[in-house]
Structure formats: structure tokens, C-alpha cells
Swiss-Prot record:
Location, primary (coarse class): cytoplasm
Gene Ontology CC: one annotated term: cytoplasm
Assembly and oligomerization: Homodimer.
Record InterPro entries: GTP-CH-I_C/QueF, NADPH_dep_7-cyano-7-deazaG_red, QueF, QueF_N, QueF_type2
Name of the coding gene: queF
EC numbers for this chain: 1.7.1.13
SUPFAM superfamilies on file: Tetrahydrobiopterin biosynthesis enzymes-like
Family indicated by similarity: Belongs to the GTP cyclohydrolase I family. QueF type 2 subfamily.
Protein name (database record): NADPH-dependent 7-cyano-7-deazaguanine reductase
Keywords assigned by UniProt, alphabetized: Cytoplasm, NADP, Oxidoreductase, Queuosine biosynthesis
Pathway of action: tRNA modification; tRNA-queuosine biosynthesis
Extent of the signal sequence: none
Disulphide linkage map: none
Active site: C181, D188
Length: 274
């Protein structure tokens, strides 16, 4: 489905009765083709969605709440457009379910169907809220650099590596990622962590490259995949992982992770801005 046909940017009727048809899938293939990604994919990973505004009724009509987390595999053929996701979650509000497990089962069934792959769903009940973590992304901050930046359209020419030097293993972070919704033009604010093994990557160039997304339009997942592919092509690291945490909009935050080597899934700790 084309993003222009999604609920984004259109007058909205908010349903309060459960309706799985509200989910609007968008194929990943189109955006991947634009940056030269085909089969097999040069990465694997997950999109972590956190939904903070989930509520339903129990069998006696009493409202229940939970925080839902969705783990969408990067190899799924589709993503779900975020406003349609919000409307879908809102449709639970006046619908009675026998249990939280029944809600989780419905979420897993519907979102898996929309994405075209098995999606893992976890619900955190109010009794578990105190266990939820908040932390910043680990790594050496690129934002410490005092530099000029004047390019705000994606420019991978900033990316360079010193292949005549000994390989290094580094984790770099920045809070200066900004991109824009391709349908509404609304800004998307994020932090990104880049871990790699290979020739040393020029830090100033990498930061200027991330800043160059400032006027770029793309969904969160697409931006992270572009970052991954541009670094892989320009700097040729042996190992590479890119993880972004975007600030919340409409009760949802989206946190894509891409890697080309086996490693544990990153934790789902919220950053301060989230």
C-alpha cells in the first residue's frame, strides 16, 4: 500500500470498538530499492515499538491499561504506518476482553498479519511499571565535537575511514538525528548508536552525515537502513550495528535495530527524551 493512502495527514474518526482493519501495512521493498537493497538483505534485526496508550475493558467493564512492546523482524515484508497503529490501538478502548492474555493474543495476530511475519508482543501491566528501565545509549558521544555543519540533505560523501590504520572496535552515539515524516512533513527526533569493527571511521564526517538527515523524509525504519547501508558501503567495516531510538509521537515510539553479525538484542530502555 502507498503511504499517501494511509490515515496520515487526513481527518480522523477515532474508533473505540476493536477493529483490526485499521492497520495500514506499507511494503519495505520500495524504500529499500531506492537505496539499492535487494535480496539477500545486508542486515538483520528488529523494529521495537512501544505503545504507551493501550487500554481495554475487562469482562466486568472496568478499564485496564498496559504498555505494549512489539518486536517486528526486519525481514518482514511490511511495516505498519504509525497513525494507523495508533488508531488500531485506540479501538481497544471500549472493547471487553476476558484477560490481558486475550489482548496480547489479538495484538500478536493482527500485527503479525499486517507485517507479514511473526511479531512478538509483550504487555507490561501496572504492577510491572517500576521495573521498566530508563537509560541513555552507551558509547562515545559524537556531539562533543565542535564543528561546522551546513548540509541538511543526506550526503554519504561525509563518510570516510582510514584503511591504512589498524582496525578498531568502537561504539559511537549522537542525539542529533532528525528526519521528517514522508507524508505529513512532521519532524522525527532520535538518538542513534553505531557500533562497528574495522578501519577507524572519521568522527566529524560521521556526525556531519547524521546531521545531513535534517531535511530528509523517510520513515524511521527506512532512515536507519539508509544509515546502515551508507556506512557499510563507504567505510566497509567488518561488523556493523545501527540502533536508533526515536521520541514518542501519538503514544508510540519506534526503535529500529540493524546488524550484520550475531549479537544480543539491544535492551529496550527508554532514553530521557522518550
Amino acid at each position: 500500500m502507498n503511504p499517501e493512502h494511509s490515515p496520515l495527514g487526513k481527518a480522523t474518526v477515532y474508533a473505540n470498538q476493536y477493529d483490526a482493519s485499521l492497520l495500514f501495512p506499507i511494503p519495505r521493498a520500495g524504500a529499500r530499492e531506492q537505496i539499492g537493497i535487494g535480496a539477500p538483505l545486508p542486515f538483520f534485526g528488529t523494529d521495537i515499538w512501544n505503545a504507551y496508550e493501550l487500554s481495554w475493558l475487562n469482562a466486568r467493564g472496568k478499564p485496564q491499561i498496559a504498555i505494549a512492546t512489539f518486536y517486528v523482524p526486519a525481514e518482514s515484508p511490511n511495516i505498519v504506518e504509525s497513525k494507523s497503529f495508533k488508531l488500531y490501538l485506540g479501538s481497544f478502548a471500549q472493547t471487553a476482553f476476558e484477560s490481558a492474555d486475550a489482548v496480547r493474543d489479538a495484538l500478536k495476530r493482527d500485527v503479525s498479519a499486517a507485517c507479514g511475519a511473526s511479531v512478538t508482543v509483550r504487555l507490561a501491566t501496572p504492577a510491572e511499571f517500576r521495573k521498566l528501565q530508563m537509560d541513555e545509549l552507551d558509547g562515545l558521544s559524537l556531539d562533543r565535537l565542535d564543528l561546522d555543519a551546513h548540509v541538511y540533505e543526506t550526503d554519504p560523501s561525509f563518510l570516510t575511514a582510514s584503511h591504512d590504520e589498524a582496525p578498531v572496535e568502537e561504539t559511537l552515539v549522537t542525539d542529533l538525528l532528525k528526519s521528517n515524516c514522508p507524508v505529513t512533513g512532521q519532524p522525527d527526533w532520535g538518538s542513534v548508536q553505531i557500533h562497528y569493527v574495522g578501519a577507524p571511521i572519521d568522527h566529524a564526517g560521521l556526525l556531519r552525515y547524521i546531521i545531513s538527515f535534517r531535511n530528509h523524509t523517510g520513515f524511521h525504519e527506512q532512515c536507519v537502513e539508509r544509515i546502515f547501508v551508507d556506512i557499510l558501503r563507504a567505510c566497509q567495516p567488518v561488523k556493523l550495528a545501527v540502533y536508533a531510538r526515536y521520541t514518542r509521537r501519538g503514544g508510540l515510539d519506534i526503535n529500529p535495530f540493524r546488524t550484520n553479525y550475531n549479537q544480543p538484542m539491544p535492551d529496550n530502555a527508554r532514553t530521557a527524551r522518550q
